[in-house]
Amino acid sequence: MKPPALTPRLLLRAYALGIFPMAESRDDPEIHWIDPRHRGIFPLDGFHISRSLARRIRRMDWRVSVDEDFAATVEACADREETWINPTIFRLYVELHALGHAHSLEVREGETLVGGVYGVTLGRAFFGESMFSHRTDASKVALAFLIDRLRAGGFTLFDTQFLTPHLASLGAIEIRRSDYHQRLTVALEGNASFTPEGYWADPASVVQRNSQTS
């Protein structure tokens, strides 16, 4: 029997169960479903902004945008020697974006995309999928603005899937699968907005709000 066709709705059901898709490589057509024993998350009140990053944000001449070019952000995340984003996964995330369940936050130098992050939203959970940086600290800037936005929008869970040394240095932690599923259940019971009404994110305010909570 053929497995059911992979659709955006099926993908959202998987996220609600705490599993996510990955491919072995760009050229691997097979999709693997992952439910790690230990899960990386970002406590939304625990993002670490170093003094150097705070200075970078306050003085930066980059522009931060939201959902201006979702597909280009995903493409930039996949543009590396090894990637888990194959054509099927790319298509699914673009379709999720069209449905309002996937969003990107971009960092631009002029009109050039130099950093960014994208993820999936469901209830009050944000599932961070991937990020990239073509300038020093561009991905850190993207994360600072993203976490500020998630807090303002009422999100309670920022799932990073795995914990890397880079994410740990910024405040991400690792929790057990059972703890993660409990947090996910609570997050799915409510609603949040990635574009909260009246929200404004100028650099100085982002630094101040993150400093107050970390």
Curated annotation (Swiss-Prot):
Primary location class: cytoplasm
Gene3D superfamilies for this protein: Leucyl/phenylalanyl-tRNA-protein transferase, C-terminal domain
Entry's Gene Ontology molecular function annotations: leucyl-tRNA--protein transferase activity
Protein localization: Cytoplasm
Signal peptide (residue range): none
Name of this chain's protein: Leucyl/phenylalanyl-tRNA--protein transferase
Keywords: Acyltransferase, Cytoplasm, Transferase
EC number, UniProt record: 2.3.2.6
InterPro entries: Acyl_CoA_acyltransferase, Leu/Phe-tRNA_Trfase, Leu/Phe-tRNA_Trfase_C
Role played: Functions in the N-end rule pathway of protein degradation where it conjugates Leu, Phe and, less efficiently, Met from aminoacyl-tRNAs to the N-termini of proteins containing an N-terminal arginine or lysine.
Lineage: Bacteria, Pseudomonadati, Pseudomonadota, Alphaproteobacteria, Rhodobacterales
Gene Ontology terms describing biological process: protein catabolic process
A GO cellular-component term linked to this record: cytoplasm
Coiled-coil annotated residue ranges, if any: none
One matching Pfam family: Leu_Phe_trans
Keyword Ligase: no
Record-stated family: Belongs to the L/F-transferase family.
Enzyme class name: transferase
HAMAP family reported for this sequence: Leu_Phe_trans (MF_00688)
Catalytically driven reaction(s): N-terminal L-lysyl-[protein] + L-leucyl-tRNA(Leu) = N-terminal L-leucyl-L-lysyl-[protein] + tRNA(Leu) + H(+); N-terminal L-arginyl-[protein] + L-leucyl-tRNA(Leu) = N-terminal L-leucyl-L-arginyl-[protein] + tRNA(Leu) + H(+); L-phenylalanyl-tRNA(Phe) + an N-terminal L-alpha-aminoacyl-[protein] = an N-terminal L-phenylalanyl-L-alpha-aminoacyl-[protein] + tRNA(Phe)
